[in-house]
Amino acid sequence: MKKIVGEMLAPLPVCLGLIGAGLLLLWFTRKKFLGKVLASVGFVLLTLLSIQAVSGRIIQTLESQYKPLDVSHLQTRLESAGEPPVSQIVVLAGGISGDPTLPPPLQISKASRERLLEGIRLYRLLPGSQLILTGGSGLQSVSEATILSRVAQSHGVKKSDMVLEVQSRDTKDHPRFVSAFVKDQPFLLVTSAYHMPRAMKLFAKYNLFPIPSPIGHWRVPEGFPLWYWLPGASGLRLAELATHEYLGLAWAWLQGQI
């Protein structure tokens, strides 16, 4: 039910709903003015959210909360404080295709691919570290964590250096199941930059100590090209991601998860 409501509140359904309601009022009722207002608001909102100059700024309100991790700076800070180096890297899954006939690298989504590659990069920079890959099976027969581990092995990560957390179904489950592996030790948390604020709040609620390592920040294109100011699917996708995260934050707050 939560996912259905989330999909219905995404920018495209909301805008189309406003336009549709406005047209119905215009065609079949005497409330012409209200119909014009609803249809106009829906059209203007859809147009604005489809422009990357607008939707990009919205998603940056999430992504700007955590900067990319500087590993060398982190190591220096830990050494100067007399603390042991971080040895665990938690990678949050970001979805899979669900098509088992595809090779593992093609089964994972763009978000999962970015997160996993960042986790592997950190793993190589931190000798002796361990990758903790998250993600249950959901409707698929094979868990997300298992597929991520297969891709990681193809990139040279040793199977013995990975731990699979295969019970979580969504973001709210990750802290509960990951806590069994990290206990009270600091760890690197890898997820998409727009997703990091919600993930950090959820892990903090479990009294865990994540060190954020966000990946996939949206950047303003150099030179402000024409397409940056025109409506398009890419802009609408950014608005959808931002809306999903803000709805997720609101839901988590209402449920007392953050």
Show which residues each predicted segment covers.
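Hydrophobic alpha-helical segments of integral membrane proteins
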Residues: 1-5, 54, 58-62, 243-250
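Membrane-embedded alpha-helical segments of integral membrane proteins
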Residues: 1-27
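Membrane-interface helix-boundary motifs at transmembrane edges
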Residues: 27-35
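Hydrophobic membrane-insertion alpha-helices, especially the h-region
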Residues: 37-52
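A structural signal for short, hydrophobic/glycine-enriched beta-strand patches
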Residues: 48-235, 239
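Extracytoplasmic/luminal low-complexity segments enriched in Pro/Gly and acidic/polar residues
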Residues: 225-230, 237-258
